[in-house]
Amino acid sequence: MKRNIILIMTLLALSIAYADRENDLPANLNSAFTLGAKNSSSLQVNFTLPEYTLQEETQGETVYRKIELPLSGTLLDSGMPELPVICTSIAIPCKGTVNFEVLTTRQTVIPDFLPYPVQQGNNLESPKSFVINNSYYNSGGTYPETLMEISEPSILRDFRIITIQINPFAYNAQSGDLTVYQDISFRLNFTDEQGINELVSEPTNISASFGKIYESIILNFNDYRNTMVANTPPRYLIIYGNNTDTNFANALNEYVLWKKQKGADVMVASTATSEAGNSTTSIKNYIQNKYNNVETRPDFVVFIGDTVGSYTIPYYTQSSGATDYNYTFLAGSDQLGDCFIGRISVENLSQFLVVLNKIYLYERDINIANASWLNRMMLSGDNAPSGISTMYIQKYIKEMSLLTNPDYTFTEDYGSSPNYSVINQTLNQGVGFYSFRGYIDWV
């Protein structure tokens, strides 16, 4: 379930980044799935394995083989075979449970196959200690044990969804055979039993701001497309750290006006006790009350203020780190955000004005002739202790980005100790996108 959530959130982030590209949404592997017969109690789904290649990887005197399947994820058990997986999401009925049954399969077998093991550590071009589960490679059985998995239902704002993970490659260490599933047909069965994360009713008023995300990750979104009203103004909820500085108020009003000029509906509140309040609980409740009313349900929540300074806004703590993401858990008991959230992390008026000038330059006053930096990206991953997935997600972002814009260039930095001077230098030179995954603590 955890890796399914990670995949979904990665797709969410990418969909946000490319939301303005109407006809150039990055490709994904949803094309590997097609929908079959459906009714109120079941849905048939057909899977066809996309084209893949085999590459050799030499470690010492041993030659391993690696399966290359663009845009796919992989199993991430350190030292075990690195085998691609393919996922999609399905919108399911608002109530009930889901199970599946495999109907038919077509597979081939590649004999004498030695798969490259998953490595926890630096990017593949850097020296590191080689990791292999010798116990499995010497006498293990079939890995993975299951052909497919489905997650528990989650709520992604308007939809109740499940994630389906197909494991099209299965390795048997005893025989040395790699089984490749070329075609799989399966059926999802929907029951009336009480399930988890149920919705009150089927989607009737879908957020246009989430439209590209739904289109990108929900395989059967076309069944619901007509319930989304095109060109609906995005709704912003801006919450700022309470203060009485008239210069701050003037700058804030200018920012709100700019959002309205762009066509957004904007609601504004401070952390005064009479408004949103100054604790995580009161602010979360304030956002929740706005969300529960379809007339005020925010698509975007923007905090103005850092965790210290003149405009403080409190934060949640996750694994000893500060986060605002918990504020977006507004529907269901899952960890999928139900609105977008961002923080303008400023401690004083001077910082606020600098950030606003950058926002206006980017959104309103940009000089395209001098904006080559829009085609540059910085990708960085700190894999200690977060693991190799910090690199895999950045590589995935790179693949998706190049499908959208082949002119993108990249500065990449991976390792257990990120090179902060490289990161700062790259940011100062200008980038259109910056993605960092892992632990971070530098000025």
Positions of PLM-derived features:
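Hydrophobic h-region of N-terminal signal peptides that target proteins for export
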Residues: 10-18
